[in-house]
């Protein structure tokens, strides 16, 4: 009898063990939940060609706040679910998913059975104790085919086009604008819904995505068949890109900086006198009187008297005007003092004696907008240039120093800086866009900023590539940086034609702007800028107006005219960006996905 009882207990224990290993399956809308001994997995179709995957440990939760994804309701889809001892098979009209019950890993196929992508191993959760919270390092590995190319991830100025065999750290800096969206020549994309430091790595064995802070692992697999369709799926989840006013696609004249009203108006008048095509003039920083009044949100009356009349004169000459503002605020400004009274400022003092406001706090964003509206929009400003939205608090120069300084701030309105490291620009642009649209529907929103994150295309913001130096190598790297940025689903990108700095930040022209060698580089960068989504000259140390480049100026004028001759075509493409989720600046693999010779070409595009 004793041996029979022992045998029965062994059988029962084995059955329980096998049940724990194979997992329990629960049907949910458009998908299933799988529960195993040490991992929970949720698979849901958000469209026939988009699947969301959430994985979490038993002690954690599937719940989370998504800042990037705004599609929060599931459509009615005809999803079939079949279960056997080992697998759960989910089928939509476009995709089949195999969920392995033993360990919760997934494999994706077309409806005809062709492999799309496979998870290489089960998800990895490593408990970690951080300042202010306990969480997990999270990681998912994938198995790719050897012959596919990978693109996206935002803007990285390392000169690489195809990210096969590469490692990329996703941390915002002055010249790195990151977004965790990856796209393949095989017609799939992954949107990785995490805001902390993230590392993409591709080796011969596996491709992996690792993030520093997460309660769960959350990603979307988008299968479009073509790269255009994948990007459309990304925008289905995160928002459409609005159409700018036609003027925004014309030429933008800027420099660091126009020092007073007379200089600004004289540049506008000189362009019209010379009959050089142009739509836009930009007032950079220091329209305030000192660092203590940094980003005060109104013109210094001594340098720019009667700003409303000044802008009326600009508008009367068929110009639009954009102005630079910062999330860092000087201590003598009224906006700083009201932010401080409400507890909306971070304690860290920035490099120009300012403090940054907490853009994760909706009330702080509303207060920020109040000062913009009353001091700048009210006098006729057409567009906002929001600088330093990484945020680059202390003028850090590397990803490591930027990460360290941002984390040192500690907490924001939503949680720890480690958890929301990369999302400052997204939440700030989101709220600025919403406030502008709520206040007036008479003018389309245009903004320029130096950072990006997934979803930011919905905010009417263009990103520029940061404070680059002037050199041929840096110029070359702009091309692959801009292409991968646009292939990450964010359609509007630009750069400082001529480089922000001539003889520093990697710039090599120590003899200044009158050096013919620099003028030649400027001309080539100007020609490239002609064929970028947004056409903008900007920089320091030397004037950037078209007539300031000696024998090279006629070449600049020629390409400026070419931009305007192309305007009907450019504006038609811009409508396709909004209406059809098109990409204007196209890496060659988008149009030649079956030609491996195009995969690493980072100096050509469509």
List each model region and its residues:
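Generic recognition of long tandem-repeat/solenoid scaffolds
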Residues: 30-36, 53, 86-93, 106-109, ...
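Broad, structure-driven detector of short, well-ordered beta-strand segments within folded domains
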Residues: 41-45, 95-101, 188-190
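Short beta-strand-initiation
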Residues: 29, 38, 76, 85, ...
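A low-complexity, Ser/Thr/Gly/Pro-enriched, surface-exposed linker/loop concept
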Residues: 29, 44-88, 126-127
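Short, exposed beta-strand/loop patches in secreted or surface proteins that constitute
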Residues: 22-27, 34, 43-44, 77-83, ...
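Bacterial Sec-dependent N-terminal signal peptides
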Residues: 1-25, 29
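Hydrophobic or amphipathic alpha-helical targeting/insertion segments
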Residues: 92-118
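Catalytic-domain carbohydrate-binding cleft regions of carbohydrate-active enzymes
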Residues: 114-606
């Amino acid at each position: 009898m004793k041996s029979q009882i022992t045998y029965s207990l062994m059988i029962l224990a084995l059955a329980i063990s096998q049940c724990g290993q194979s997992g329990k399956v629960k049907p949910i809308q458009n998908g299933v939940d799988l529960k195993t001994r040490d991992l929970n997995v949720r698979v849901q179709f958000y469209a026939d060609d988009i699947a969301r995957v959430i994985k979490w440990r038993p002690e954690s939760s599937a719940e989370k706040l998504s800042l990037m994804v705004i599609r929060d309701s599931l459509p009615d889809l005809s999803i079939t679910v079949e279960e056997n001892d080992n697998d759960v098979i989910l089928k939509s009209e476009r995709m089949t998913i195999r969920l392995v019950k033993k360990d919760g890993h997934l494999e994706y196929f077309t409806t005809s059975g062709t492999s799309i992508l496979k998870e290489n191993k089960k998800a990895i959760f490593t408990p970690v104790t951080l300042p202010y919270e306990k969480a997990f390092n999270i990681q998912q590995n994938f198995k790719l085919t050897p012959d596919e190319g990978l693109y996206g991830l935002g803007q990285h100025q390392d000169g690489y086009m195809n990210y096969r065999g590469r490692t990329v750290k996703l941390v915002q800096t002055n010249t790195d604008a990151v977004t965790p969206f990856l796209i393949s020549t095989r017609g799939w994309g992954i949107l990785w819904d995490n805001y902390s430091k993230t590392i993409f790595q591709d080796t011969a064995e596996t491709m992996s995505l690792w993030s520093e802070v997460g309660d769960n692992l959350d990603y979307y697999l988008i299968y479009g068949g073509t790269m255009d369709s994948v990007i459309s799926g990304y925008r289905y989840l995160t928002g459409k890109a609005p159409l700018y006013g036609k003027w925004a696609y014309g030429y933008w004249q800027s420099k660091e900086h126009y020092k007073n009203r007379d200089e600004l108006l004289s540049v506008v008048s000189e362009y019209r006198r010379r009959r050089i095509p142009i739509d836009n003039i930009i007032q950079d920083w220091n329209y305030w009187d000192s660092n203590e009044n940094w980003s005060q949100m109104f013109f210094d009356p001594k340098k720019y008297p009667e700003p409303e009349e000044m802008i009326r004169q600009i508008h009367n000459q068929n110009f639009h005007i954009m102005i630079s503002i910062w999330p860092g605020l000087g201590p003598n400004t009224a906006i700083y003092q009201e932010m401080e009274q409400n507890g909306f400022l971070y304690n860290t003092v920035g490099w120009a004696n300012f403090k940054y406001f907490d853009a994760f706090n909706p009330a702080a964003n509303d207060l920020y907008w109040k000062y913009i509206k009353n001091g700048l929009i009210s006098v006729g400003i057409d567009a906002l240039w929001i600088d330093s939205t990484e945020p680059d608090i202390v003028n850090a120069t590397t990803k490591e120093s930027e990460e360290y300084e941002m984390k040192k701030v500690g907490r924001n309105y939503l949680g720890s800086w480690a958890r929301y490291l990369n999302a400052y620009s997204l939440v700030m642009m989101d709220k600025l866009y919403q406030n502008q649209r709520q206040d007036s529907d008479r003018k389309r929103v245009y903004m320029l900023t130096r950072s990006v994150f997934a979803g930011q295309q919905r905010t009417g913001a263009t990103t520029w590539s940061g404070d680059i130096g002037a050199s041929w190598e840096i110029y070359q790297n702009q091309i692959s940086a801009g292409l991968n940025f646009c292939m990450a689903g964010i359609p509007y990108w630009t750069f400082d034609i001529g480089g922000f700095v001539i003889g520093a930040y990697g710039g090599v022209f120590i003899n200044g702007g009158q050096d013919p060698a620099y003028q030649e580089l400027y001309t080539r960068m100007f020609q490239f800028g002609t064929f970028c989504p947004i056409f903008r000259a900007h920089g320091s140390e030397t004037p950037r107006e078209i007539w300031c480049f000696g024998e090279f100026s006629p070449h600049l004028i020629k390409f400026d005219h070419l931009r305007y001759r192309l305007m009907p075509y450019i504006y038609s493409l811009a409508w396709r960006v909004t209406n059809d989720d098109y990409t204007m600046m196209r890496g060659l693999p988008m149009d030649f996905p079956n030609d491996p010779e195009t995969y690493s070409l980072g100096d050509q595009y469509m």
